[in-house]
């Protein structure tokens, strides 16, 4: 399945409204294509704050996609993340690993793997931790499967919500017994969606990103939650959480390299 682009240039952002109808209508039989023209004509709805985003890169986009999250991480370091999914059809757990190949990931060649083995993640030349793109790619693929909609449609909603300059809130979290300062971004990309009636169960879906320079890779936690009845997030219908677990220096060096240091003891994020 072809990966999508997660970062807009200024020209792409400015042209979205004009292009949205043709992009969505190109997929015959798409569940949301019938309303694509109306969404584009309304600038993705005046009620949606994401539609009024500046052509400039928003701080939230810069934090998630344009920051060098892997700076300072040595080659052959493995970053481990726990993934937990709750809700129908079943509760699932997984481990996602990011292996740093080049120092600071300068070559953009970090490798991502999960229970199924190596995962191709669209790098797009972005300096960010690829686990962010891994999580978002999985999320929109799941939305497509659950709703019968189009991946590109859901991806655009998430991008617009981040482009709307959502608040970046300072938070303090407990990571393996230590207080860690972090930055939190929360978005709900499907609120006021003109096509929301077609996937009403997911209108209130919430995305939370927690970033911290206190951990290697800077991704402390990413979570999505589909609220229960009456917008109840205390008892979500579905949730998926990716949380940082630690960093490990591999004992198998790259060809021509010396054996790296022993395991790096780093704080683990509490879920």
Regions found by a protein language model. Give the residues of each.
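Acidic/proline-rich low-complexity IDRs
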Residues: 3, 7, 23-24, 172
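Bacterial N-terminal signal peptides
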Residues: 16-27
């Amino acid at each position: 399945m072809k990966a999508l682009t997660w970062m807009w240039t200024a020209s792409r952002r400015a042209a979205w409204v004009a292009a949205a109808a043709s992009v969505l209508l190109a997929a015959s039989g798409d569940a949301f294509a019938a309303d694509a023209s109306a969404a584009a004509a309304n600038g993705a709805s005046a009620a949606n704050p994401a539609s009024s985003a500046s052509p400039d890169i928003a701080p939230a986009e810069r934090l998630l996609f344009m920051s060098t999250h892997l700076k300072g991480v040595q080659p052959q370091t493995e970053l481990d993340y726990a993934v937990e999914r709750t809700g129908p059809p079943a509760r699932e757990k997984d481990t996602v690993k990011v292996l740093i190949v080049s120092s600071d990931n300068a070559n953009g060649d970090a490798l991502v793997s999960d229970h199924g083995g190596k995962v191709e993640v669209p790098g797009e030349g972005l300096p960010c931790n690829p686990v962010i793109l891994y999580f978002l790619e999985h999320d929109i693929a799941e939305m497509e499967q659950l709703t019968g909609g189009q991946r590109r449609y859901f991806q655009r909603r998430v991008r617009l919500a981040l482009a709307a300059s959502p608040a970046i809130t300072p938070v303090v979290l407990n990571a393996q017994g230590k207080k860690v300062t972090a930055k939190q971004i929360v978005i709900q990309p499907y609120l006021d969606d003109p096509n929301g009636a077609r996937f009403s169960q997911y209108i209130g879906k919430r995305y939370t990103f927690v970033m911290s320079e206190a951990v290697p890779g800077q991704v402390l936690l990413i979570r999505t939650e589909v609220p229960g009845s009456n917008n109840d997030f205390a008892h979500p219908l579905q949730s998926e959480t990716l949380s940082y677990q630690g960093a490990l220096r591999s004992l198998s060096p790259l060809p021509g390299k010396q054996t790296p240091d022993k395991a790096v003891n780093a704080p683990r994020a509490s879920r």
